[in-house]
């Protein structure tokens, strides 16, 4: 029966980063994903300070900074009028070298991670699905569905469930996924807009009449 130390299920940002960390530490994982190709839309846009700090250890932070867009502050609007401005550098400049919000779309992030993994000899096995697995105590035996429809049994010391909200890894373990669904309907669109040039800051419109500006003490 084929084996490898770690089987990673799911090749989104979480699975890709885990695979990259392991590969750099000398552990070559097997990385599978049931989709035919990586994402082609932006989806999640923001890379936060802690992620950039971790990316710096993987020699990725500078690339993300060069390819993305730095957002130094956010402006809050109510009914078409500006009400408040939150300066990220003012809040966290003494806590991190990345005291800003970095815009770097998820699809570009995934392509960057995939390219770095391939440099280390790890590739994503697409259209390969985890059907189930059983825990043998000192190892896990995974049942996989391959792209050609054949089934494969694979043994690993660890299985990492990076397969999202409907994770079969988590379901097999009997673990719940607490939380709820927003009642509101949200749209995410990638568009090229025209109009007055913005100053590079993020703008957020709030559907409320009154806005209280909170006092933020980042020393606590």
Per-segment meaning from a language model:
Residues 2-4, 148-158:
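Core beta-strand elements of the Rossmann-like FAD/NAD(P) dinucleotide-binding domain
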Residues 8, 19, 55, 109-113, ...:
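Conserved structural-core and active-site-/substrate-pathway-adjacent residues in large, well-folded domains
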Residues 3-31:
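N-terminal Rossmann-like FAD-binding beta1-loop-alpha1 element of flavoenzymes
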Residues 115, 158, 162-220:
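Conserved FAD-binding catalytic core of PHBH/FMO-like flavoproteins
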Residues 126-140:
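A conserved short coil-to-beta-strand element within the FAD-binding core of flavoproteins
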Residues 12-13, 38, 164:
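Residue-level detector of alpha-helix initiation sites
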Residues 40-120, 134:
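Active-site-adjacent segment of FAD-dependent monooxygenases/related oxidoreductases
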Residues 35:
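Residues in the short beta-alpha loop(s) of Rossmann-like NAD(P)-binding domains
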């Amino acid at each position: 029966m084929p084996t490898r130390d770690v089987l990673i299920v799911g090749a989104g940002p979480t699975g890709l980063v885990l695979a990259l960390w392991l590969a750099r530490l000398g552990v070559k994982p097997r990385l599978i994903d049931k989709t035919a190709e990586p994402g082609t839309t932006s989806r999640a846009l923001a890379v936060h300070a802690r992620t950039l700090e971790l990316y710096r250890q993987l020699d990725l932070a500078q690339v993300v900074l060069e390819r993305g867009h730095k957002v130094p502050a956010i402006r809050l609007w109510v009914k078409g009028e500006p009400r408040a401005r939150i300066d990220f550098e003012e809040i966290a400049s003494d806590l991190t070298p990345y005291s800003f919000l970095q815009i770097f779309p998820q699809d570009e992030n995934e392509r960057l991670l995939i390219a770095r993994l391939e440099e280390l000899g790890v590739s994503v096995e697409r259209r390969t699905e985890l059907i189930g697995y059983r825990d043998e105590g000192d190892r896990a035996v995974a049942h996989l569905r391959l792209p050609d429809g054949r089934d494969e049994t694979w043994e690993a010391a660890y299985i990492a469930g990076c397969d999202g909200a409907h994770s079969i890894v988590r379901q097999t373990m009997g673990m719940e996924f607490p939380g709820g669904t927003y009642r509101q309907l949200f749209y995410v669109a990638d568009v090229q807009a025209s109009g007055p040039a913005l100053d590079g800051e993020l703008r957020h419109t709030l559907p409320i009449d009154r806005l209280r500006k909170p006092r933020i003490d980042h020393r606590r």
